[in-house]
């Protein structure tokens, strides 16, 4: 289906691309080299590259599959017949950073944040955590998948850690039937595996069981689980395919399926960001152009068509639930929530890189929908503190930090609220969960 939708989308956007500034075409070799995440490199990366080539007015755009698994070239042709090639190798996120280090890639694709040791390793390329270098191009969710006829409907993150570490060995221990649990996981190079390890295993001091069957390909893993009645695996959202996804609970959160609305706000416990990393001292204008294109409305339309969650801002109705404070219920009765949460750098009141990118998107929405004058409310949340009043104050201060940025562009707010540690979306027992709980929601009337 994706292979049908994407060409139609790209053709539909053709008139919009005619005015793009032309990029230089190298005399020899590829115009751009991208290495890293298989989650990005399988479909999304190639689709974004095709969109950029189309924007450049190239003709006969197509993919050429390499003899090596998970490698391909995206090829186009100028009106004068010159061939333009973009190389994509998708062997896992860590391979992208290694390729930046040895200068065999111009751009790294990653389905997890860059690690501290990689930052140090690549410091000669500049600060890859800076806003210009670290670019969030899409949101994805790790789906926990079962055989489609498995009756289980939800699992919590503690259970997941015990299952994938091999401590819980049978479906009967989970309240089901079927005997031994068969584990399926991505390989060690995969950002998908790194994300699962960081969100589920490492915070609980556990490691993946040696009995797990490992895969470089997301599609092959999903297909294997869907054919194994005793199987369980984790996979990027677009690769659920014929398998069954279950709802996930983290700490005191509500059970959440990997729904678009919950992933867009990053409330879903196993949501994650997908990145391009662009070196500061890179000399390749095609890399700069692809990052800019990916962040544009045209690029985000391709993100959505590829099965990931675009960062396009939308207003959503929210249904009341028993865990909501009265003040929050009063807001949802009359307002709609935007599909963006602002989050912060760890241990800081500074907006993180995605939040900085989202400021302009939220501002565009507010202006386009004529919400500048007292029709926007910011709602802050935080992690649990021993003093609930302090938690409430800190959550309101986070909302004020977002307010300070948006008032510069003329937004007059209706209300700024802070609800402290109410309504957690993640467990407060780990740093990752505390960071997710420190968030600011945007509501419009």
Regions found by a protein language model. Give the residues of each.
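Residues at or immediately flanking beta-strands
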Residues: 31-33, 85-87, 373-377, 413-415, ...
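Periplasmic peptidoglycan-binding/anchoring modules of Gram-negative envelope and division proteins
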Residues: 337, 343-379, 400-403, 407-412, ...
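Flexible loop/hinge segments at secondary-structure junctions
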Residues: 21-348, 352-357, 434-436, 444
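Periplasmic OmpA-like peptidoglycan-binding domain that tethers envelope proteins to the cell wall
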Residues: 381-445
């Amino acid at each position: 289906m994706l292979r049908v939708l994407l060409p139609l989308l790209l053709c539909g956007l053709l008139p919009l691309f005619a005015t793009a500034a032309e990029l230089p075409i190298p005399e020899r070799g590829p115009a751009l080299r991208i290495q890293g995440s298989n989650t990005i490199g399988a479909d999304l990366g190639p689709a974004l590259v095709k969109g950029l080539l189309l924007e450049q007015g190239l003709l006969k755009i197509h993919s050429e599959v390499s003899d090596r698994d998970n490698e391909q070239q995206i090829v186009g042709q100028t009106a004068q017949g010159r061939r333009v090639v973009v190389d994509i190798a998708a062997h896992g996120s860590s391979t992208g950073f290694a390729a930046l280090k040895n200068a065999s890639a111009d751009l790294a694709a990653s389905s997890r944040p860059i690690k501290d040791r990689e930052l140090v390793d690549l410091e000669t390329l500049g600060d890859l955590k800076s806003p210009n270098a670290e670019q969030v191009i899409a949101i994805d969710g790790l789906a926990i998948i079962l055989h489609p006829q498995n009756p289980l409907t939800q699992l919590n993150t503690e259970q997941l850690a015990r299952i994938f570490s091999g401590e819980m060995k049978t479906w009967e221990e989970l309240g089901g039937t079927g005997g031994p649990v068969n584990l399926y996981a991505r390989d060690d190079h995969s950002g998908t595996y790194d994300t699962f390890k960081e969100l589920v295993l490492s915070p609980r001091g556990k490691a993946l069981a040696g009995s797990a069957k490992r895969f470089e390909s997301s599609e092959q893993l999903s297909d294997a689980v869907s054919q194994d009645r005793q199987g369980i695996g984790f996979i990027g959202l677009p690769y659920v395919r014929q398998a069954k996804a279950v709802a996930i609970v983290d700490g005191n959160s509500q059970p959440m399926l990997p729904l678009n609305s919950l992933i867009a706000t990053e409330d879903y416990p196993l949501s994650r960001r997908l990145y391009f990393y662009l070196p500061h001292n890179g000399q390749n204008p095609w890399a700069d152009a692809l990052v800019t294109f990916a962040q544009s409305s045209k690029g985000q339309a391709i993100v959505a068509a590829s099965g990931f969650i675009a960062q396009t801002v939308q207003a959503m109705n929210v249904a009341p639930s028993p865990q909501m404070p009265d003040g929050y219920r009063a807001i949802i009765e009359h307002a709609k929530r935007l599909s963006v949460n602002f989050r912060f750098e760890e241990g800081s009141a500074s907006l993180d890189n995605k939040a900085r990118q989202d400021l302009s998107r939220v501002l565009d929405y507010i202006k386009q929908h004529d919400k500048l004058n007292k029709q926007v409310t910011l709602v802050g949340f935080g992690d649990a503190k021993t003093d609930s009043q302090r938690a409430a104050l800190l959550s309101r201060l986070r909302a004020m930090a977002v307010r300070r940025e948006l008032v510069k562009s003329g937004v007059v707010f209706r209300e700024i609220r802070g609800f402290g540690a109410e309504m957690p979306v993640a467990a407060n027992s780990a740093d990752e969960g505390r960071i997710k709980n420190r968030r600011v929601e945007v509501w419009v009337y």
